[in-house]
Amino acid sequence: MLLEVDELKWSEFISVYGKGSLFIEPVWLSITATNFGYGLKYYIWTEGTEEVIGFPIFYKGKTIKSPTNFHFFPLVKAKGIEKQKNIAFIRSIENLKRRFGSIRLKMEIDFPYQKELEGLGFNVTEKFTYIKRLDNLNYSRNIFRMIKKAEQQSYTTSLSTSFESSFSKIWESNKGYLLGSNKKQIFSFFSALIKKNFSQILDLHQDGAHIASLLVIEDQNQKVVYTYLISIPDRKKYPEVQAMLYNYGMSLYKSKGFLFCDLCGANLSSIAKFKAKFNGDLERYQYAVYNSSYFIKIEEYIKKLIRRW
């Protein structure tokens, strides 16, 4: 049975079974939902008194989707054998399909039920990102050259001391990428995350002038740092800045005991080519989309064809 539970029950559930990602944490989820005006629900599948799986969802109207493009759908496995969890997941999604007309999920790397989603009528698209192990900060020669050049040009790196100034630079470089987003809303969101130690901005200066910034998201549960957004200055004037900022971020979080850096995307060839130079591992994840109106139209079309025959 799929049960909707409150935040207190969810917190109890993940305290027992949730050795997972940042994306199951009620504080993170609540900040995200409140800031973007989304609904938030927590679900647990039970068999008798046994809890089998659980997950949170964001929704708007009759659509399940995340307000941001970096939030993964987190599935928490509890009791039972793998077959029970598999069936529980299928039954849970079938239940959600009856309640919502559209479902859009970004699946975690190595999500185990891709075929099950396809069998449930989801269109599953494969995407890529680079994951860099922080115990080995070995890069391509090109990256090392850029870092060495930057070190010779009086650049300095530090944690941001002015969120507003740093965020403004990031926004100007990424507002096309964040199409449809409201600057005030995004500003408020990341400001709240930083106050809760879920996010941080790293700055690069030259002779006192603020040149560029990198916004990262910290998953302290899994010891993963996500290099989410970077401001991009004039590349002809500052060709080595991005390499130095990424290296600073990875070195900093290595010193904090983090294990991995997710370089956040490798789906555009120009971006993937640059990120590949940090010698990370290319990993796959999926977007899964279900739209009931689409399948209703397909069914109607098939029925018309059958009638003709």
Placement of each model-derived feature along the sequence:
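A conserved beta-strand-loop-helix scaffold within acyl/acetyltransferase catalytic domains
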Residues: 2-48, 56-63, 107-129, 135-235
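A short, structural micro-pattern
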Residues: 51, 69, 99, 123-126
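Conserved acyl-donor/pantetheine-binding loop and adjacent beta-alpha core of acyl/acetyltransferases
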Residues: 61-72
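A short, internal acetyl-CoA/4′-phosphopantetheine-binding micro-motif in the GNAT/acyltransferase core
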Residues: 71-83, 229-238
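Aromatic (often tryptophan-rich) hydrophobic motifs at membrane interfaces
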Residues: 87-92, 191, 198-300
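Generic structural signal for hydrophobic
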Residues: 96-97, 150, 193, 253
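Conserved GNAT acetyl-CoA-binding A-motif
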Residues: 98-109, 254-264
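Terminal substrate-recognition subdomain of acyl/acetyltransferases
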Residues: 109-153, 265-309
